[in-house]
Amino acid sequence: MAKSHLPPWLLLLLLPTLCGPGTAVWATSPLACAQGPEFWCQSLEQALQCKALGHCLQEVWGHVGADDLCQECQDIVNILTKMTKEAIFQDTIRKFLEHECDVLPLKLLVPQCHHVLDVYFPLTITYFQSQINAKAICQHLGLCQPGSPEPPLDPLPDKLVLPTLLGALPAKPGPHTQDLSAQRFPIPLPLCWLCRTLLKRIQAMIPKGVLAMAVAQVCHVVPLVVGGICQCLAERYTVILLEVLLGHVLPQLVCGLVLRCSSVDSIGQVPPTLEALPGEWLPQDPECRLCMSVTTQARNISEQTRPQAVYHACLSSQLDKQECEQFVELHTPQLLSLLSRGWDARAICQALGACVATLSPLQCIQSPHF
């Protein structure tokens, strides 16, 4: 099989997905999936949500044998797994995280940040590598037929859990942990905050638009017809997938496993402003920009408090209050409905007509280029 030229960053982004179906971030109602292939194959997201990717690739987007799809999927996962073992992959991430430790605003946190990296970074990488199961991943995507149940993930090794935290954690962990040593620091040391902050910095620095083209290179390993469809889908959806995986799954998985942090991210956090979005996500159209800002803030809040969060978003100094309130009054019901299905901000704003939509998978299939 041809060698992949994907950048090593890609594996970091896919690790949460590769660690098993328990980390799935999308949620589509059973009633929606019950509509059948007409609903499943409208988009890559819906095919994944309804676990019908294999059906759509075989019957709607192209014609290829089930065994071929299963084998190609496992080959791709194995390529990505090998990439995590490359020194350049680990060194690049390690150097970036060390720099982030150095520039922490509170200098008292710098030594402890470096200590956490020295001790737990190699252990975490090794643990994730050992948990990747190509067949289970491809079964979860619907590209391999279900067989015998796969063995569950190994429990987190004791050496991966901060031992000094175990005795101090409450019965129900909160979103913040306490000081490792009250004698060394005059204020509580928020390790969970530190963990999430470092991961968000990684998210912000990754050029998602550039990666979209790089991800499509992996499509050369699949059959010709499906390969063309794969390339179109990869270029269209990579940014969406990266935003979801990095923004939601990775912080919860890594920080939850290593630091036993709560998975409830909304407690004590300020909704991100428009400036927190990666550069390529800042639209020029005012209505699209407004929609992206409101939707992004609402996505990072628990479902119960989203209606209030949508209205509070208009208080942002970056938005025109009157235009924002008009937009919210008009679109809130549909916006909340799409948020509950797990849609990302750009897809929602395209569905609402606020942002210009690019090619859909069905348009890709009809393209004369393949």
UniProtKB/Swiss-Prot annotation:
It holds the Pfam family SapB_2. Residues 66-148, 188-265, 284-359 form the Saposin B-type domain. Glycans are attached at N300. Residues 1-24 form the signal peptide. Keywords: Disulfide bond, Gaseous exchange, Glycoprotein, Repeat, Secreted, Signal, Surface film. Gene3D superfamilies: Saposin-like. Residues 25-184, 264-370 form a propeptide. Disulfide bonds join C70-C144, C73-C138, C101-C113, C192-C261, C195-C255, C219-C230, C288-C355, C291-C349, C314-C324. It comes from the Eukaryota. GO terms for biological process: lipid metabolic process; respiratory gaseous exchange by respiratory system. One of its GO terms (cellular component) is extracellular region. SMART domains: SAPA (SM00162), SapB (SM00741). It is found in: Secreted, Extracellular space, Surface film. Residues 26-66 form the Saposin A-type domain. Pulmonary surfactant consists of 90% lipid and 10% protein. There are 4 surfactant-associated proteins: 2 collagenous, carbohydrate-binding glycoproteins (SP-A and SP-D) and 2 small hydrophobic proteins (SP-B and SP-C). Pulmonary surfactant-associated proteins promote alveolar stability by lowering the surface tension at the air-liquid interface in the peripheral air spaces. SP-B increases the collapse pressure of palmitic acid to nearly 70 millinewtons per meter. Homodimer; disulfide-linked. This is Pulmonary surfactant-associated protein B. It comes from Oryctolagus cuniculus (Rabbit). The gene is SFTPB.
